[in-house]
Amino acid sequence: MESSSSGTTSSTIQTSSGSEESLMEQRKRKRMLSNRESARRSRMKKQKLLDDLTAQVNHLKKENTEIVTSVSITTQHYLTVEAENSVLRAQLDELNHRLQSLNDIIEFLDSSNNNNNNNMGMCSNPLVGLECDDFFVNQMNMSYIMNQPLMASSDALMY
């Protein structure tokens, strides 16, 4: 009998050992499946992140292109306005110079008119030595002088 009890014990140990092995195999397979699923989710998450970043890069490239185009257009407008301003400044200088010349002429004519009244009909310029004509101080003739363009000869500009 002794032999039968020891045989039963060893078969029980083998059976329990076999069920433990089976249980360990199941756990191992379950862990492998879980790890595979986790790795698959991780790959999908990385792929989604990569797709999102690629979309963001494309969006930023498009936005950058729009900004560069806008800056280029703005630069062109700036250069156009700067050129127009340069022309207007030159015209302003020219008109200021013309105004100063006209004011000088008026001042000269006014001083000549005042001197004529004081000199009793003689010209204020002693070098001329001629009697002053009312042509230069007559208001009707003044409009003729004022409407003439001011021109400088090329010799007058050389020092």
Curated annotation (Swiss-Prot):
bZIP domain: which residues?
25-88
| Source superkingdom | Eukaryota
Q: Which GO terms describe its biological process?
A: negative regulation of translation; positive regulation of DNA-templated transcription; response to sucrose; sucrose induced translational repression
Q: Where is this region: Leucine-zipper?
A: 53-67
Note down the stretches annotated as region Basic motif. Answer: 27-48
What are the annotated GO cellular component locations? Answer: nucleus
Print the keywords alphabetically.
Answer: DNA-binding, Nucleus, Stress response, Transcription, Transcription regulation
Paired cysteines (S-S): none
Q: In which tissues is it expressed?
A: Highly expressed in stems and flowers. Expressed in root tips, cotyledons, leaf vasculature, embryos, apical parts of siliques and funiculi.
Q: What factors induce this protein?
A: By light. Induced by hypoosmolarity. Repressed by sucrose (at protein level).
What SMART domains does the record tag this protein with? BRLZ
Q: What is its main location?
A: nucleus
Where in or outside the cell is it found? Nucleus
**Carries keyword DNA-binding?**
yes
Q: Fetch the Gene3D superfamilies from UniProt.
A: 1.20.5.170
Annotated Low complexity bias: 1-21
Query: Region Disordered: start and end of each range?
Result: 1-47
Q: Which Pfam families match?
A: bZIP_1
Give the PANTHER family listed for this entry: BZIP TRANSCRIPTION FACTOR 11, BZIP TRANSCRIPTION FACTOR 44
- State any further remark: A highly conserved upstream open reading frame (uORF) coding for 42 amino acids is essential for the BZIP11 sucrose-induced repression of translation (SIRT). Plants over-expressing BZIP11 show severe alterations of plant growth and development, reduced seed set and viability.
On subunit structure and binding partners, the annotation says:
Forms heterodimers with BZIP1, BZIP9, BZIP10, BZIP25 and BZIP63. Interacts with ADA2B.
Q: What does this protein do?
A: Transcription factor that binds to the DNA sequence 5'-ACTCAT-3' in target gene promoters. Promotes POX1/PRODH1 expression in response to hypoosmolarity stress. Positively regulates the expression of ASN1 and POX2/PRODH2 genes, which are involved in amino acid metabolism. Regulates several metabolic pathways such as myo-inositol, raffinose and trehalose. Regulates several trehalose metabolism genes, including TRE1, TPP5 and TPP6. Mediates recruitment of the histone acetylation machinery to activate auxin-induced transcription.
Q: What is this protein called?
A: bZIP transcription factor 11
